[in-house]
Amino acid sequence: LTLKLNGAVVKTATGTEMAYTHQLDKQGNYDFELTATNGTETATATASTCVPYNPTKANRPAGIVNGIYYDKSDNTKVTLCTFAGSKTEPAKHVFVVGDFNDWTISNDYQLKQANDSAYFWIELTGLTPQKEYAMQYVVVRADGVVKRISDLYSELVLHSDDSWEPSQNFPNLKPYPAAGEGYVTVIQTDKPEFEWSDATLNFKRPNKNNLVIYELWVRDHTPARTFEALMERMEYFEDLGVNAIELMPICEFDGNDSWGYNPNHYFAVDKSYGTSEQLKDFIDECHKRGIAVIIDMVFNHTTGQNPMAVLYPYGNDLKYNPWYNNSGSIPHKDREFEPDWNHDFGPTKTMFTRCFQYWLNEYKVDGFRLDLSHGLCGTTDDDVEHLQEYYANGVQAVSSDAYMILEHWDSGASTLVNAGMMCWENTSEAYQETAMGWYDDKSGSKSDLSRANKDDYVSYCESHDEERSFFKAKQWGDGAMTTDEAVRVGRVPLNMAFLTLLNGPQMFYHFAELGFDDSKFQNEDSKWGKNDYGITSELGADYDAKTQVKKRIEHWLLEGTVQMAAFQKVGQIIQLRTRIMPEVFEGNPTAATLTDGKALRTIQWGSDVFVAGNFAASGNQTVNIPSGTWYNYLQETQQSGSTLTLAPGEVVVLTGKQVALPKMPAGYKFKTDIEDIVVIEPTEMLPPYNVQVYTLSGQVIMRQTNVMNADLTGLNTGLYIVQYEKNGQTIAKKVIR
């Protein structure tokens, strides 16, 4: 046995064991190498550590602030800069470890300290262009505690949870490094640039007050739950007529299955949905069809996996963390169980401003919806509106016509609207009532449809938070709609017309166009949990099921279904606004009857468009038609007579000039990807496999040994992970039962 330290032999021995003690009393690197030989074979093991030098003090290179900077003139070089400090003092030392130095803590990779500040930086050279390197910072805090963190500005991160994701979701994903701890950053110089089409480069965003927004959760819209699968539905979105798609949060979040309101890295796309290139493909295809893309951002809070939260974690250490508000001191109670960003801190504001600008520049998104915007604050909430204006100015600096939509319920909403932003307007209760055939609303109440008839406020019949209107119609609707699907779904175009043909920006949650009738508070076994009001169904499930898997809708879109008939009519109604007469709807309606408690409601856009609907569950209604020449848009006929009789649940749309009714598909045949059997490919190298089936929470619910096929027939419907070994590697596949 031979032991070397920094290349010099320090001890030799004969046998199978050696003991050696060395006092690490001098600053520097210590590289140990132990060699064992029996005369014919030799084995070597190495270990390295260091006693840190005091960090070199040096100004950051010009233009380097915080994050990852690639040198366009040198594709073998990257500059890293990170903030590492408490409210009162910087860290003692910061090192970078990664694939480029075998994850070794070394003085050679200690970051320089910028001007006695809490910013530390380093230039890495000699990297292979386009090669991916995993890396982390090792921070020695001022109190001596050592933390490993990713880069706050990471565009791709890895986590040990990635092994649970099907490989097809993110092809060729770099394996998680054995030496990693928590989230690790991936850097890559000379990354190929995405080629945007002219449709994106020259995209003209729809007028903000003429938006018809389709809120979409990537996980639930297709069985495959990916950006790539959404690409297969572009005709569907185009036929529906919406001119904006709002994606629920897609930034990296904890775990692999979430709404996304638990973010940890704001510059990285969550890998469960696919690659950044696939997201760009989706955005580009939307632009080719005149559809803007809005993304939902969560700047109120983060999880404890954010690198700045890891550095001084939630709990006792949080009081030292300049990035977050202290628990118990924040003026609002929203999300107080997660680290709450301190927006008084300059680097916090800089990060989020850069985040907005990054998504506009890198992904060509068209705007943002800001979750829980009324909760954004510093140590007080006195300046919330000014803070929103600060961020809006950052957006406008990059793109003057980008959308800024706020989930802002406070009285300050009018101030923000006057500053050019849009605010959410929750009108879902009104549309639940009209869907059920209960129309005795009172002006000014939540069931008042006129609240959805104004510029600058995004009104909606459903959002991800609200109950499904046609679930309520199925449960508590008037007359036959609780038992007759055709009657119930036949009311969908009526409800949608009196949303999408009103004034101002409008929104609905995906599948509202089909009259989706599963409760938001119902899981995949059709059991209900508590709703937002704490009401639990008679089935007694004691949990919130809003994020649980819901039933699939692909069979509804086949030719001849009542849902497909509703979709066809809804698409024609929306296209009237977004494609055929957008200039009309960019103005203001001249008259509307929305709040008088009568079954008959009307909307009039001068001599251009007249809409009438009968919201009753029984009994016809007669409407007086405004004077002039009118054409029945949905029937492609000229209107004769001065009155129209409407059946229960019927809507009529008249136009002042004859326009072509858009041709709609008879149906769609989308992939279902639902399999009861997972076939495991046989190989000549291995015998039959041992298979384990897990729930998404990690619970083992099935074990099968020596099998070539895993039979899932006996399991409840839902999403599972099937794990087995192949060629010495553990393989995990996500399967929908």
Q: Where are the model-predicted features located?
A:
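Basic K/R-rich, polyanion-interacting modules in nucleoproteins and related proteins
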Residues: 50-94, 149-209
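Short beta-strand segments within Ig-like beta-sandwich modules, predominantly Fibronectin type-III
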Residues: 10-16, 110-115, 702-706
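Aromatic-rich carbohydrate-binding modules that target alpha-glucans
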Residues: 80-130, 140-165
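Active-site-proximal helices and loops of the catalytic beta/alpha 8
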Residues: 251, 259-261, 291, 355, ...
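Substrate-binding/active-site clefts of carbohydrate-active enzymes
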Residues: 156-158, 193, 197-364, 373-383, ...
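C-terminal beta-strand-rich structural cap/linker in extracellular carbohydrate-active enzymes
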Residues: 641-662
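C-terminal outer-membrane/trafficking sorting elements
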Residues: 660-737
